[in-house]
Amino acid sequence: MNAVTKITPHTDYKIADISLADWGRKELDIAEHEMPGLMSIRRKHAQTKPLKDVRITGSLHMTIQTAVLIETLKDIGADVRWASCNIFSTQDHAAAAIAATGTPVFAWKGETLEEYWDCTLDALTFTLPDGTLTGPELVVDDGGDVTLLIHKGYELENGSTWVDEPASSHEEGVIKALLKRVAVERPGYWGRVVKDWKGVSEETTTGVHRLYQIAEAGKLLIPAINVNDSVTKSKFDNLYGCRESLADGLKRAMDVMLAGKVAVVCGYGDVGKGSAASLRAYGARVIVTEIDPICALQASMEGFEVNTIESTLGRADIYVTTTGNKDIITVEHLQAMKDQAIVCNIGHFDNEIQVDALKALKDVQKINIKPQVDKYVFPNGNAIFLLADGRLVNLGCATGHPSFVMSNSFANQTLAQIDLWEKRDTYEKKVYILPKHLDEEVARLHLEKIGVKLTTLTKDQADYLGVDVAGPYKPDHYRY
């Protein structure tokens, strides 16, 4: 599609349709009521503005809930530029509502990969009063794309030849082409970006995995906070969020009756647990695939059959990948599936399913049914339905997680951004997790909304347990 672009002395944006702003604002108002943690943090810091004039780039699904996060960061002082972290996840009315307030946002549903990475660069590009192009001081990342781009750009300026190596995928080729272009158009740009960059907070399992890989290689340029492994993120967003949004995505995409169907959930981490619970709640017969014996045992103890993908071919109706790994469902698996099986992903990247290999098959007919629903017909007459082109089904085919559970995640993100900035001179170039007392505080902020009343320890009880009356109540090694 053709995005609407506007550049003025005060704001710039690339979105689908600015006329959707009023609709977006109405939904924002509803979401704020459902996001008590985020709104409480906004009220607490509205006067002190701990992020005053701090340049923040966000790369995170441009949804209504994210719009509430953006406005929270702005209300506590930040100078924000935003892009989505997925080509299909933007809610265009949410992007319009944010653009209408003067916040630069670069996102629309249905971007090409070239447009997506251009939008990421736009969100990264701040202009100083003297006209110099620079980057953010803090980053809110989801999947690690901004972190990857800055690191690869900086390495290129310091002698890396990675951009000249053959690309392993179409998307990698797009990234390399972008970096080559920036090298010509903005000499020394990435060095200026890194000089001012103070930290990143990462939302997802996939992005955190990238961060640890970079850190283990000794190449991490900044301190990073692993928001994903906060208990109030991973055990809520990943688990309870997926429990509601997976079925929502499947039903909006296919109008399918889940009861009685055989559904395969690939992976039984927190996302897999939520996905399996979602399908079982509707009456599906769920089979789990796993590599980890602990997760496999957990799934079995919950009553799920645990087996291999190969054992399900020809009998399963629905496949859902949740792993964060690549090549979980291969093109050979796709060709051997039951006729008209539904295939989707609720992990992060589309490489969990071999989508590129599917598209490259000879004599395969692709039929677009509606946006984000494609039917692939094989030469033998059998077909599969691929949802959201192998990207996130809950955001590509529906609206993602509900506001309340995202309030947990985004409260963590906001606290992480404040902590990174206030302690920017003490953090080392490592990956950190938010301290336990902040994790408990995020949970506490959401209790009143759902009518929860906490029991209070006596001083004697607290002394017996060796904790403070006000918490934290669990050691860091405790597994919830």
Swiss-Prot record:
One of its GO terms (molecular function) is adenosylhomocysteinase activity. Substrate binds at residues 63, 142, 203, 233, 237. Its EC number is 3.13.2.1. Transmembrane segments: none annotated. It is found in: Cytoplasm. It catalyses: S-adenosyl-L-homocysteine + H2O = L-homocysteine + adenosine. Keywords: Cytoplasm, Hydrolase, NAD, One-carbon metabolism. Binds 1 NAD(+) per subunit. The keyword Metal-binding does not apply. Its cofactor is NAD(+). Disulfide bonds: none annotated. Pathway: Amino-acid biosynthesis; L-homocysteine biosynthesis; L-homocysteine from S-adenosyl-L-homocysteine: step 1/1. One of its GO terms (cellular component) is cytosol. CDD domains: SAHH. May play a key role in the regulation of the intracellular concentration of adenosylhomocysteine. PANTHER family: ADENOSYLHOMOCYSTEINASE (PTHR23420:SF0). Belongs to the adenosylhomocysteinase family. This is Adenosylhomocysteinase.
